Amino acid sequence: ALMGHMVNAIYQIDEFVNLGANSIETDVSFDDNANPEYTYHGIPCDCGRSCLKWENYNDFLKGLRSATTPGNSKYQSKLILVVFDLKTGSLYDNQASEAGKKLAKNLLKHYWNNGNNGGRAYIVLSIPDLNHYPLIKGFTDTLKQEGHPELLEKVGYDFSGNDAVGDVAKAYKKAGVSGHVWQSDGITNCLLRGPTRVKEAVANRDSGNGYINKVYYWTVDKRATTRDALDAGVDGVMTNYPDVIADVMNEAAYKNKVRLATYEDSPWVTFKK
C-alpha cells in the first residue's frame, strides 16, 4: 500500500491518488461528546505540510464515498484502503467506547450508505492509545446491532503509539480482535527513526503465531528511507510524496519484488513470500 499522509480536505483525495497513492490516511478529531467532528490535524504537523486543512467529518465521508463507489463520476478505482487516524487524545478514557459507537453510525450512514452500494474501500481504524481499546468493541457491536455485521469484513485495526509489540497484543486480546491487524511504526518526517521496531513487527507478522497481518511505516518522504522500508519487508509506506515512493518502487532492485496492491488483494491476509 502506498499511503498518502494527512489527506484531510476532499480535494486532496484526487491529488494524492493522482500522484500514485492507492491508500490515504485521514485525521479524525472528536468533540467533547465523543462525536467524530472534523478531518483535521492541527499544529504541529509534518514538516513542509499545511496542518490546517479540514472538512466536517460527515462531508469528508460523502466525498470519500464518491471516490470509492464504482460508477460515480468521482470514482478512483486505485483507491482501496483508508486509514482513519483517530485523534482520541482529546477524550477521557471512559469515552472510547462511545467514540467507537458514534464512528460506526457515521460510517454506516455517510460512507457505507446504510449497506446500499456505499464506498468499497477497506477501512483501518488507527488508535493512538492502548487504553482506548474499548473503541473497537463499541464500533463492532454497533455495526452488528445496526444489522450490518458483514461490513466488519471491510474493517481493520491499528494501534499507532509505537508501544511494545507484546503490549499491543494484550490490548487486542482485551478488545476481542483476532485478525485484520495492521501494525504501524514511525515518526513525523521532521525526525529520524531507526528501523528496529518495524523489523520486530515484520518478524511478528511472519512468525505464523503473531497477531500482526500487515505492517506499515510512516512518514517516509526520502528515497533512502523508502528503500530501507522496502528492504525491511513492510506492506505499506505512508508518505507526503507518493510520487517519490512510486519512483523507488520502479527501481531495478524493487520493480520485480513489490507492486501496488489492487482491490483483489486482501488487506487482511499476510503475504507469503
Curated annotation (Swiss-Prot):
Q: Which reaction does it catalyse?
A: an N-(acyl)-sphingosylphosphocholine = an N-(acyl)-sphingosyl-1,3-cyclic phosphate + choline; an N-(acyl)-sphingosylphosphoethanolamine = an N-(acyl)-sphingosyl-1,3-cyclic phosphate + ethanolamine; a 1-acyl-sn-glycero-3-phosphocholine = a 1-acyl-sn-glycero-2,3-cyclic phosphate + choline; a 1-acyl-sn-glycero-3-phosphoethanolamine = a 1-acyl-sn-glycero-2,3-cyclic phosphate + ethanolamine
Q: Which GO terms fall under molecular function for this chain's record? A: lyase activity; metal ion binding; phosphoric diester hydrolase activity; toxin activity
Give the residues annotated as active site: 5, 41 (nucleophile)
Question: Where does it localize?
Answer: Secreted
Q: Which organism is it from?
A: Loxosceles hirsuta (Recluse spider)
**UniProt keywords, alphabetically:** Cytolysis, Dermonecrotic toxin, Disulfide bond, Hemolysis, Lipid degradation, Lipid metabolism, Lyase, Magnesium, Metal-binding, Secreted, Toxin
Lineage here is: Eukaryota, Metazoa, Ecdysozoa, Arthropoda, Chelicerata
**What CDD domains has UniProt attached to this entry?**
GDPD_like_SMaseD_PLD (cd08576)
Ligand binding (Mg(2+)): 25, 27, 85
Q: Name one GO cellular component term.
A: extracellular region
Disulfide linkages recorded for this protein, renumbered to the chain, are: 45-51, 47-190
InterPro entries the record matches: PLC-like_Pdiesterase_TIM-brl (IPR017946)
Keyword Lyase present in the record's keywords: the answer is: yes
Q: What EC number(s) is this enzyme filed under?
A: 4.6.1.-
Q: Which Gene3D superfamilies match?
A: Phosphatidylinositol (PI) phosphodiesterase
Q: List the protein's name.
A: Dermonecrotic toxin LhSicTox-alphaIA2aii
Q: Does the keyword Nuclease apply?
A: no
Superkingdom as given in the UniProt entry = Eukaryota
Gene Ontology biological process terms in this record: killing of cells of another organism; lipid catabolic process
Q: Indicate the family of this protein.
A: Belongs to the arthropod phospholipase D family. Class II subfamily.
The coiled-coil segments of this chain are none
